[in-house]
């Protein structure tokens, strides 16, 4: 299967008009002949600057530069006959060949991508335009099932060659909306479930993915390649998944927009699962508007994901989320809270000044910002950073995830064909059997320092939903929702004694304990790029709200984006970096 896909990919690249070097046969040319025919160049090679936006200039696309092109701009090119979807795919293929060998954001190309683009071009020529995503290329994290010539493996060799029964529901939705599936993105293997001490963005099948701003540092995860590929201009948008931070964190670290929806607003059906209580699917894009275009085609009830039934009566009556997009004038009179204790007080030293500067700009635009809108229960927020084992066993988020994962992965694998992997036990056995690649034991593979201790911890529970499990479910829900985000949003002004619900909580999304609270609650969050750290890596400002409050995140996320007009360009610092693990 892998060799077949390689040949398919090479065939598509040949069709793309790119020369494909062939391996020299040793039967016709000896090594000595090759050496003798070479001219020795004694000139010292001068390496290009490794910290510049000029290192990988975006290739021209029919004399147009698509760098940072939005969905609206791409549609404008196609509507006016300047570019076709096929042209745009060719251009992203050029960019893929230029930068992916360094940043490793895309795991696998779709061999049929040009065929799909051509079919959508034919539709456009015949007056059929499905919507704003018609002809727009995208990628999905390698834990979204795609029923095509690509493998869905969560980055693991254990599932290579397996056959999924169907497209994931949200992938099907995007295909029907006219989006062009370009490929699968790299990720942290098994979406960070397998190990507790690991190199973020690494998988056995995909290798180490890297942040295009600084290739030596942690690119965030587990939707690493999704964010990296958008930031590197290899694709228009991408899909990610999140159980705890896996959309917000990589989007923030790569200077793009990440929208994590309420659990149950977008389907998880056909996605390699972790926890039904916290898993969600969402877009990673260049702008809030682009993210909402994608989200608009993703959300909705899916009878195969019962959690999506919870959205009934809690979404816009007309089904339109695009109407909530706004500009900076919407900030006039808006009321935001700063949960200072634990969250803001743990903001990074090289981020806090810029974060507060942005808060001041928001105030100057007419918003009212209330400080110390804190959570009621602060004991569930670690001062030592992200920790899903915090608390006793009947209070821990990790208890819930470990039990859920054991059962959910078995259910998912029950429908996958052409594989001997049917359970968590099978995965653990595979990793032990192929130790040199999958690192089943600690300190065998540098990227998996703790081996597969996450899997072993889940295996130890065996999926048993006992009293301890249900106590943990209730505790996590109550402390993150009623005593957490909802408590902070329901504010009483000490000066006027007026009580009201805030329009959102502004948080430093670069602080892992912030997105962890939204993850535990199953509540929505958005992150916006606002600056870069001293090491050149981006960071962001987040907005959190209660369940089903995506309209608020869209309205004020787009308003703040319009106010700031901020965009950082990757400088590919140390673009030849090969360090593993990354920190």
UniProtKB/Swiss-Prot annotation:
It holds the Pfam family Amidase. SUPFAM superfamilies: Amidase signature (AS) enzymes (SSF75304). Its EC number is 3.5.1.4. The active site is at residues 141, 222, 246. GO terms for cellular component: cytosol. Residues 1-19 form the signal peptide. It catalyses: a monocarboxylic acid amide + H2O = a monocarboxylate + NH4(+). It is found in: Cytoplasm. One of its GO terms (molecular function) is hydrolase activity, acting on carbon-nitrogen (but not peptide) bonds, in linear amides. InterPro entries: Amidase_dom (IPR023631), AS_sf (IPR036928). Keywords: Cytoplasm, Hydrolase, Signal. It comes from the Eukaryota. Belongs to the amidase family. This is Putative amidase C869.01.
């Amino acid at each position: 299967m892998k060799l077949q896909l390689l040949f398919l990919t090479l065939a598509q690249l040949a069709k793309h008009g790119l020369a494909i070097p062939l391996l020299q046969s040793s039967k016709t040319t000896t090594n000595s002949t090759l050496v003798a025919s070479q001219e020795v160049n004694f000139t010292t090679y001068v390496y290009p600057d490794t910290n510049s936006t000029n290192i990988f200039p975006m290739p021209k696309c029919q004399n147009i530069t698509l760098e940072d092109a939005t969905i609206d701009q791409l549609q404008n090119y196609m509507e006016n006959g300047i570019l076709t979807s096929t042209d745009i795919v060719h251009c992203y293929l050029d960019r893929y060949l230029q930068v992916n060998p360094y940043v490793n954001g895309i795991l696998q190309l779709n061999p049929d991508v040009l065929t799909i683009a051509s079919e959508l071009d034919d539709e456009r020529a015949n007056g059929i335009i499905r919507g704003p995503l018609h002809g727009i290329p995208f990628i999905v994290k390698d834990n979204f099932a795609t029923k095509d010539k690509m493998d869905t493996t969560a980055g693991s060799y254990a599932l290579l060659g397996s056959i999924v029964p169907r497209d994931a529901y949200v992938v099907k939705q995007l295909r029907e909306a006219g989006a062009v599936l370009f490929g699968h993105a790299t990720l942290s293997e098994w979406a960070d479930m397998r190990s507790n001490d690991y190199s973020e963005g690494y998988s056995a099948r995909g290798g180490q993915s890297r942040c295009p701003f600084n290739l030596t540092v942690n690119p965030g995860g587990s939707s690493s390649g999704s964010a990296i590929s958008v930031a590197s201009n290899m694709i228009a948008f991408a899909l990610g998944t999140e159980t705890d931070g896996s959309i917000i964190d990589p989007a923030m670290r790569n200077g793009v927009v990440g929208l994590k929806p309420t659990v149950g607003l977008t389907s998880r059906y056909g996605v390699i699962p972790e926890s039904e209580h916290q898993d969600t699917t969402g877009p990673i894009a260049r702008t809030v508007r682009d993210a909402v275009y994608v989200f608009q085609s993703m959300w909705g009830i899916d009878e195969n994901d019962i959690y999506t039934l919870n959205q009934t009566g809690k979404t816009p009556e007309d089904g339109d989320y695009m109407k909530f997009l706004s500009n900076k004038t919407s900030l006039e009179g808006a009321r935001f809270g700063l949960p200072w204790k634990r969250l803001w007080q743990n903001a990074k030293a090289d981020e806090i000044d810029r974060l507060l500067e942005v808060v001041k700009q928001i105030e100057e635009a007419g918003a009212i910002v209330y400080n110390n809108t804190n959570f009621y229960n602060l004991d569930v927020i670690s001062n030592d950073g992200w920790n899903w084992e915090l608390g006793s066993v009947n209070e821990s988020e990790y208890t819930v995830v470990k039990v859920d994962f054991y059962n959910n992965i078995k259910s998912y694998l029950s429908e996958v064909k052409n594989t001997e992997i049917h359970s968590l036990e099978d995965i653990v056995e595979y990793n032990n059997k192929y130790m040199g690649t999958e690192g089943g034991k600690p300190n065998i593979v540098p990227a998996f320092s703790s081996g597969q201790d996450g899997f072993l911890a889940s295996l130890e529970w065996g999926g048993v939903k006992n009293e301890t499990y249900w106590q943990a479910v209730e505790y996590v829900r109550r402390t993150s929702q009623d005593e957490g985000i909802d408590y902070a949003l329901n504010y009483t002004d000490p000066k006027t004694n007026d009580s009201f619900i805030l329009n959102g909580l502004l948080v430093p999304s670069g602080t892992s304990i912030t997105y962890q609270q939204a993850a535990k609650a199953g509540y929505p969050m958005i992150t916006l790029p606002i600056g870069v750290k001293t090491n050149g890596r981006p960071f962001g400002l987040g907005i959190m709200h209660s369940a089903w409050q995506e309209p608020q995140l869209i309205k004020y996320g787009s308003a703040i984006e319009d106010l700031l007009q901020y965009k950082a360009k990757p400088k590919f610092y140390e673009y030849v970096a090969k360090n593993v693990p990354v920190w």
